[in-house]
Amino acid sequence: MKLKRSERLIDMTQRLLDNPHTLISLTTFTTLYQSAKSSISEDIAIIKKTFEKQGVGIIRTVPGAAGGVIFVPKIKREQALAAAEKLKEQMNDASRLLPGGYIYLSDLLAKPNVLHDLGKMIASAYEDKKIDAVMTVATKGVPIAQTVANYLNVPFVIVRRDSKITEGSTVSINYVSGSSSRVEKMELSKRTLARGSNVL
């Protein structure tokens, strides 16, 4: 499809945002937009500069015939500090304190903007590491794990306290619960994670 440059820039930006940590070849873009590589390279340079300036992330270029571009979501240090400070203020509310020294967080973990900030901060810290999956124990960690996995473009895996028959065979470990001081069990479906995976 032949698009005006402004339309092409918008579409290209969306494709990069939708496919983080994924190599997209220049040929893909030239074919898609019916444009010369030189024009696509100029477009990418504009997007790269804007992403870095606005704290959206960075665009890495991979040279060679099989090369292309990779969008890596990354939060600016000042943006991360501001988000962390705002979260700290919300968590310091005395009404959040629960018996046993716990803090009520469910409402914060239900807010998309909080998850967005937390997910991007965590993903930024691991953007140069080889991560195959993000793992969490059900259920409180699920929203954050899913957001981080989205930014890293990897699967997220849930470890459960009780296995479901629909998950097939599982691997399990016993641990001492911090909240109840009882020995409990964590179970993971063997099909959800390949042997030797790098897990966050």
Role assignments for model-derived ranges:
Residues 2-200:
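PRPP-associated nucleotide enzymes
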